[in-house]
Amino acid sequence: MTVPSDVLSGIRSLRGSGVLPLGATEMTPEGLRVCVDRCATFRGVLCGITPYLRPAAQRQGCVLINCPALHTKQTVPSPDTLALGQLRTVLIADHLGAQLRRQGYTVSFCPALPQDSDIVNFLKTLGIDWPTVPVSWTNEDREEKMKKALENSTYRDREIERGKRRSGGEEIEGERRGIKEDVRINLKQVVQDENLQGYDPSLGTCTVQREALCHLAQLDSATTDFPISTTTALHVTSCQDEFRQQQTAMLWRATGATAVQRLVICGPVKTPGIQMNAAQYLQLRKAQMKDASEMKYGDQVEGQTWDDIIKVMTSATMRFELLSTVHTSPVTLDVQRDSGVSTKGPRGGVFVMYNCARLHTLFSSYEKGVEQGLYPEIPGGTELDFSALKEEGEWLLLFNYLIPFSELLDQSGQILEHEGSTARVNLRTEQVCRFLVSLSKDFSSYYNRVHVLGEPLPHLFNQMFCRLLLLRALRELYHSALDSLNLPPIPQL
C-alpha cells in the first residue's frame, strides 16, 4: 500500500493545538506508520501546561440552573425531608454550574433559599454555595406577575374553565391557594406551537396551582438580568419529577418566557433494605470517615484541622458516589454502618483525595530537601533532557490525562451548543469523577513503582527534575478537576 507524497508531506507538516510533534514516519505493508516524538511532546506539554488545564474554548451566554428539589412545597425543604435522589440532583446542579462558569458562561442558580436555614447550612457542609435571600424576603410581586401573565395567556383554556366552573365554596378554597378562579393552560398547544421536541405526549391542560406560581416567580427572578436571546435554562430533576417539571417548563413558556429550556434527568438512588434521607446519609459517611481516620492516625485525629479534613473527605465520598454514574442511570449505595471506607481501595472519592494528598507530601519533601541543600531548584524545562522519561507509565499519564484534560472540561459547553434541541440533554456529568478515579489508579501504580526523590547526586538530577515537572503538572490537574467538584485539596490522609 502506498501513501501519496502530498498526503505524507501534509501529515509531516501538521502543526497546531492538539497536534503532537512527529518523529519518524515510514511505509509498511499495512500503510503509513507515524511515530510521535515523545521527548518533544513531554517538553512541549510540561513547559506550557497552562492551556491543558483550562477548557479548550471560552464561550458566551447565560445559563440558569434550576433545581426543583429545592423549591418550596408546603414548607422550605430541609436535610431531613431531602431524599437521596433529590440530593443527587443538587450535587449535579452544583457541578454543572462550576463547569459552565469555567467555560465562560454566566451562571445563576434557582431557587434562592432562606439565609441560615437548615438546608443552606447542610449544603455548605458539602461545599455548595447556593444563593440565599433574607428570611423576611417574599416574591409575591413576581407571583402576581406570573399569575396575570397566565390569566392573559393565549394558551389559557377558557372553554374547559367554563365547563368546570366550581361552586362558591370551592372558589373560596381556590382563593386560599392564591388563585381566585381556576386558570387552566393548554400545555399541549404550547408544545405544538413552539415545535418543541421530546416532551411527553400526554401533556394536556394543566390547572395552575400556587406551588407552580412560586416556582415560576423564582425562575423569573433568577433571569431578571439575563438577556433572553442567549439564555438557557437547565432543569436538573429526578426521573420521578420529570413530568411535573415538563409542565412547569411549558407554563413558564406560556407566560411569554423564551429562554431555551432543557431537562437534565437524574435516575433514582437506591439503598436496599434501608430508608435514608440526605441528613442521615451525611451523618453515616462522616462517622465512617472519622472511624477510618482514627484507625490510621489514632489520637492525632482531633482539632479543627482534622474536622476540616473529615468534612472535605465526607463531601468527596458522597459526591463521587452520586456523580460517578451516568446521571440518567440509577445509583445503588452501600449504607451499612460497618462497611466503612478505605483510603487505598480504588473506590472513588477517598482514593482520589488520598492520591492528591500524596503529591502534596512529595513536593513538601522536595521543598524541605531544597531548604536543606540536598537538591537544587528545578531548572527551566528547556534545560532538561526529557528523554529521561522512559517509563511507559510516564507517557500514559501525559497522553491519557494531561493532554486530553482541556477537552474534558469543555465537554458540557460543546453539548449545550451542538446537541439538538430536544427536551432532554445528557451533559455527561459523570466524566470528571471517572477521569479522576482512572487517573488515580494509573498514578498510584506508577508512584508505587518509581522512586521520584532519589539520592542527591548530580547525575540523577535530570531524571528527577523531569519526573517532578510531570508530577507537578498532575498536581495542578488534580486541583483543577477537584475545583469543578467544589472539593479543596487536602494535605494529608
Specify the residue positions occupied by each region the protein language model found:
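Non-catalytic interaction-recognition regions
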Residues: 1-493
